[in-house]
From Swiss-Prot:
Name by which UniProt lists this protein: Carboxy-S-adenosyl-L-methionine synthase
Top EC class for this record: transferase
Gene3D superfamilies, alphabetized: Vaccinia Virus protein VP39
Underlying gene: cmoA
EC number: 2.1.3.-
Subunit structure: Homodimer.
Sequence positions that bind S-adenosyl-L-methionine: Y39, G64, C65, S66, N132, R199
Amino acid sequence: MKKHDNIYAKALNKVDDFKFDESVVDVFPDMIQRSVPGYETIVHTIGELAKSSVTPNSMVYDLGCSLGAASLSVSRAVSANTCEIIGVDASSAMVERCRRVVQTFTLPNPISIEQGLAQDVDINNASMVVMNFTLQFIPPSDREGLLASIYKGLNPGGILVLSEKVKHPTRSGNELLIDLHHQFKRDNGYSELEVSQKRAALEKVMLTDTFNEHETRLKKVGFADVVMWYKCYNFTSMVAIKA
């Protein structure tokens, strides 16, 4: 049974920067479902994309794997013994919990979970790389280099699935999307206090780009095409394809 997210339910004297610590890990499944519109659709579709993209004897990397939802989706969607999946997360608490989650299943394709920064992962022989709401937490100065490393490590025809919270290029449009997202959270039981304190906690650690900035950067490092396949409010998922 999912634990209820009430991390920001009481007024805090000081709202610290958001981090994926033990308190967040404990409530993460509830938090992500109530905060990200279409999260289940995104995770399911990552598996669907894997069916047509993951090739025999290749690697799949899930960078910023959290509790392994995307890794599990890929493992179950692809024919048995097709690939090896490596999930990587910077949070020690998340890695420890993710390993426990993964070990509870008998999986068609093996998943190993490692602790580390996405920027430090050596991508090789990859048919698919997933970053599901990860790049937005990586320092902007590191983003292009990370994407270049992913592109280099992907086999021809390989894909990067990149899901991100994005900002709209106009101020009024961006505020509209933020308002819609905040209402989505209220509809899912978060109070005004929770919404405002969570926003303050994320302000300095989650730095978003526009879709055009993502597309330009992905094409700059070599990707032949970038397809936005999902968007709701200021949340999107895209597929970058290596020719």
